[in-house]
């Protein structure tokens, strides 16, 4: 199946989009996220949300129903200018189509969006609850957010000293690799942390994820429709790979930690076709 026809053959499922922009906070990430979510509406959804990261921390805004409901929530409580963001449109699987169950899910410094189904989430949820965490949703994704936050916190404690944002982002890569090695099922996961707001860490297994390569900004999406309005340069993410996205760099590793160079291509259709 070619990359150009794959978009039209996907069955309804969650849509995800990510953006990392220049270090000066702005509305750019929110603009990219909302445009991308609009172009992913063809996948079907029953709720939507965004998480935006900047020097002031994380803002998470979400709503049940259509994107207009999310736009209304954003107008009622505008998020601070950001340097990075992740967005999601959800088809309910674990947990009903409510605002609480909508993505992104937050745990401590972490916010996560997810496309897929974590088959062993009940056992992992019990583990998270025994660690003293209170979960507010019925979703498998919130469990992953807590696992990432717990793992990252342990790595930060083990470091024994204050780390800069770049070092924290690398630790989040290690946390993502450790957590996803324990997950059973299919997933495309995007995570941001208020401790390193200029980065997205992501991973995939049996669920679509594509990189968009920009100039001074980079993108992620369930498919190229999520970012084709901003760049036509795309790169593949293979199964069980983990990646770190900043405004100027994209790093991809296999599950054993070996750095890889992703295959790239030019998208042949323009944004007018992705509506």
Where are these regions (language model features)?
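Conserved short alpha-helical segments that host acidic/polar catalytic motifs at enzyme active sites
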Residues: 2-275
């Amino acid at each position: 199946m070619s990359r150009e026809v794959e978009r039209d053959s996907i069955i309804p499922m969650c849509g995800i989009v990510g953006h990392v922009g220049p270090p000066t906070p702005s509305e750019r990430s929110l603009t990219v996220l909302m445009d991308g979510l609009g172009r992913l509406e063809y996948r079907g959804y029953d709720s939507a949300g965004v998480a935006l990261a900047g020097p002031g921390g994380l803002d998470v805004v979400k709503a049940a129903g259509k994107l207009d409901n999310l736009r209304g929530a954003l107008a009622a409580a505008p998020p601070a200018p950001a340097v990075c963001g992740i967005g999601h449109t959800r088809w309910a699987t674990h947990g009903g189509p409510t605002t609480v169950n909508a993505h992104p899910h937050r745990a401590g410094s972490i916010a996560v969006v997810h496309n897929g189904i974590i088959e062993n989430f009940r056992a992992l949820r019990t583990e998270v609850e025994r660690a003293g965490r209170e979960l507010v949703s019925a979703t498998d994704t919130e469990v992953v957010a807590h696992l990432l936050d717990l793992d990252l916190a342990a790595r930060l404690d083990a470091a024994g000293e204050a780390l800069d944002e770049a070092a924290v982002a690398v630790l989040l890569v290690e946390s993502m690799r450790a957590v996803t090695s324990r997950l059973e099922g299919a997933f495309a996961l995007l995570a941001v942390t208020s401790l390193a707001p200029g980065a997205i860490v992501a991973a995939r297994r049996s669920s679509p994820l594509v990189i968009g390569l920009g100039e001074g900004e980079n993108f992620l999406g369930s498919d190229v429709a999520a970012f084709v309005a901003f760049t036509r340069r795309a790169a593949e993410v293979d199964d069980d790979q983990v990646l770190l996205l900043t405004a100027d760099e994209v790093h991809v590793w296999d599950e054993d930690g070996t750095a890889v160079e992703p295959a790239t291509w030019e998208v042949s259709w323009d944004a007018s076709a992705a509506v």
